[in-house]
Every structure is written in C-alpha cells, then in structure tokens.
Amino acid sequence: MAKFDAHLKCSFCGKSQDQVRKLIAGPGVYICDECIDLCTEILDEELVDSQGNPRHSSESNRKSATASHKSGKPAPTLATIPKPQQIKSFLDKQVVGQEAAKKVLSVAVYNHYKRLAWQGDGQGETDLSATRLHKSNILLIGPTGCGKTLLAQTLAELLDVPFAVADATTLTEAGYVGEDVENILLRLLQKADMDVEHAQRGIIYVDEIDKIARKSENPSITRDVSGEGVQQALLKMLEGTVANVPPQGGRKHPYQDCIQIDTSQILFICGGAFIGLEDVVQKRLGRNAIGFMPSDGRGRSRANRDLQASQVLHHLEADDLVRYGLIPEFIGRIPVSAVLEPLDSQALESILTEPRDALVKQFSTLLSMDNVQLEFESDAVEAIAQEAHRRKTGARALRGIIEELMLDLMYDLPSKKNVKKFTVTRTMVDEHTGGKVLPLPANDERSHQESA
C-alpha cells in the first residue's frame, strides 16, 4: 500500500503526491491544490469579463450575497409608526366588518414595529439590564372569503413593508418532495427586490395553516411529512433564527451560495379556515352534560350546543388547537389569535360598494375607459350579495357572480359607440342567477332608455 501511495500523481499537471501540498482523489482521477487554484482563477476571470463583478471565492460569494443589498429605506421609528387607532381606521377603509379581528391586529402590529424601532435605537442591544422584547406572531381563524389575506395585505400597504403570501399545503419536511420552508423567505426577499435589510422588516402571511395539522393525536403512528414535520420545520423560523435561503429557490445543497436572513424581525401571520374546530370547542364546552346533572347544568350545555360556529370559536383555547392537530410548540410561537366572523348578506353588500377597491367601482372604472357609465341599482347589489351568501364562499363569490353577469355586457358595449350609460337591474341578476342568461337589449332600445 505504501508503494502504491508513493506513485499517486495529479491527473492534470502530472506532479506527484510529494510535490504538492494536497492531492484530492476522485473516481479514478486525482487533482492537486495548485490545479484547483488555477481553475478558480480562470472561473473568476470569466465572471469578471461577463458580469463586471469580480468574485474571488465561494466564501466571498456568501458574504457578498448577504451584504450586497443594503436597504435604501429607513428603519421604522417611534414617530413614524402609526398608532393602533390609525391602523384600524386604515383597515376600515379596505375591510368590511371584522371589528374584533382588526382591533387585535392593530395592537399586535403596532407592538411588533414598536419593538423593531426600539431595537433600532440600540437600547435593546447596548443596555444589558434592559428588558428584551420578543415578537408575537398572529393566528387568524375564519371561513374562506372572510378577509384574512386582505387584512394582512392592507397592513403591509400601510406600513410600506414587503409582503409575501405562502401556501402551507405545498411545504414538506426537509428531504421529501415539495418546497422547503426557506422558500417562504425567498418570496419575501423577491418582494423586497433582494434587499435583505428591507425584507427582514416584512410580513409573511402563511395561508392554509390548518392543512398542516397533525393527522392523528398520537404522534408516533406514522411519519407525517406534510403535517407535523412542517410544523417542526417552521418552529425556529417563527421564533427567530438566521436562515440560509437559496437565491434561486429549490432544495438546498452543501455547495451552493445562500443568502442569510434573520427572521427575528419578520412578522408571521398564519391563517386558516380550521374546518371542524368549532366541533372540538363545542365538545369541550358540552363535556359536563354527560351523565346525571342538575337542570341548570343541562340548560347551560344545551345553550352551548345551540351556539353558532362563530360564537363557539370565541371560547377557543390553546388545548383545542392541540386536539385539532397543531403541536404545542407551534401554538406557543403564535400567541396572538383572532377569530373572523363569517360574512352575512349585509356585509357582502357593503363589500360590493364601500371599500376603495370595491367591485362595483372596479367595473365602473373598466367601462369608463370605453366612455360608458355603469351603474348598479341598490336592488341589484342586494341580489348579488344574497347569491354570494348562498354559495357560501364568502367575498370570493362576488367577483365570480359579477364576471358572469357582465360577460355579454363587456363583450358588446365597447363596440357600441352611441351607448353612454348602462344600469344593472335586479331583474338581470335574478334571471342570471336563476340559470337564465339574459340577452342584452338591442342597441336602439338602450339608447331609447337612456334618452328617456
């Protein structure tokens, strides 16, 4: 063996093992440290010629990737952070209803960015006796289409911070097919134009968080790579850690350059419908009704059973989320929770007309580009809201109904030069939602109606 080792030589320059400092073996080939240095220089020269950005080594790549983007936007200060009442007033302009949830969000977001401003002043870093402030992530619970994502988007718009939406259903535990949890941070980084400092003050909304609930209360039954495994992977990110994010996304591997992001200043808002959670709470509230009880006890239990789902969720406790499938460590990192109410017909009517980006205003703006004034009768708005409420998909149903209703209108009106105004009536809505597509009146009839 010693004789064999003495004859080892570099497959590229021919130098023996004794003539070089290090000889690295591959499958049937060898390369010395001098040839490796030469290859590195050649690659660096090519990068300089093609990009005009010299990069000397993989270690310098990591440093430059982390520090190449300095934030051009100033960090928040106590003077610039909007107060909770100001935050709620801004939310009121965009989101209809959900008063309790907006109040919870306003206070939580204000405290979070006040904490960042306090750390930015250096008080929390230089004074060892100062109280350290920890962040409080937020959990939004509510049915589909009730405004969970819109609330988070509106907050990001007000605070002028990067905002990214992630789908928890695509995440899997490391080593399995699917997305790594670090890809969530990559989306935020892309929204911040790859500005690391700016991204570290952003907001991430993790949607469908209820879909990663553990499939069974027994944690040892089977490997749950898209449920409990994802919760475990998210723990450190929610709490605050320095994560290595691949700039191009995808799976991480040991030899790629990564961007380091500190998640301790990122606000995570998790949202989900949590279908069936009210049954878990109801079971706990009505547990005392089993067996022989006084009449007043049975009455209280019967009243609990009669509570609506939204009312039941106001009695939500952490143990209920554990029974639903979230692990205690995960719940502990999302201490602030808010329950959103399902939208009734009256709220859906308001959504159609009141917010800045209301659907009626959007379609009126679209037709105004064709010099046509579009109006909706109040009865028509009411009928659209009632149909959306019947479909039980919340505010998302509104756009679908109006798109279907306006299809023929949007097709014909741009070609009609002498039509300047069109009114959507309840009759049109009723006939459309009843399964009949109402044909548009002839051009001369509409003109006659308009002149009349």
UniProtKB/Swiss-Prot annotation:
PROSITE patterns cross-referenced by the UniProt entry: CLPX_ZB (PS51902)
Function: ATP-dependent specificity component of the Clp protease. It directs the protease to specific substrates. Can perform chaperone functions in the absence of ClpP.
Record's compositionally biased regions (Basic and acidic residues): 443-452
UniProt-recorded Gene Ontology molecular function terms: ATP binding; ATP hydrolysis activity; ATP-dependent protein folding chaperone; protein dimerization activity; unfolded protein binding; zinc ion binding
NCBIfam families named in the record: clpX (TIGR00382), PRK05342.1 (NF003745)
Keyword match Cell inner membrane: no
Chain sites annotated for binding ATP: P143, T144, G145, C146, G147, K148, T149, L150
Keyword tags: ATP-binding, Chaperone, Metal-binding, Nucleotide-binding, Zinc
Family assignment from sequence similarity: Belongs to the ClpX chaperone family.
Binding site for Zn(2+): C10, C13, C32, C35
SMART domains: AAA, ClpB_D2-small, zf-C4_ClpX
CDD domains: RecA-like_ClpX
Claim: Metal-binding is one of the keywords in the record: yes
SUBUNIT field: Component of the ClpX-ClpP complex. Forms a hexameric ring that, in the presence of ATP, binds to fourteen ClpP subunits assembled into a disk-like structure with a central cavity, resembling the structure of eukaryotic proteasomes.
Name of the featured protein: ATP-dependent Clp protease ATP-binding subunit ClpX
One GO cellular component, as annotated: HslUV protease complex
PANTHER family found in the cross-reference section: ATP-DEPENDENT CLP PROTEASE ATP-BINDING SUBUNIT CLPX-LIKE, MITOCHONDRIAL, ATP-DEPENDENT CLP PROTEASE ATP-BINDING SUBUNIT CLPX-LIKE, MITOCHONDRIAL-RELATED
Stretches the record annotates as Disordered: 50-79, 433-452
Residue ranges constituting the ClpX-type ZB domain according to the UniProt record: 1-51
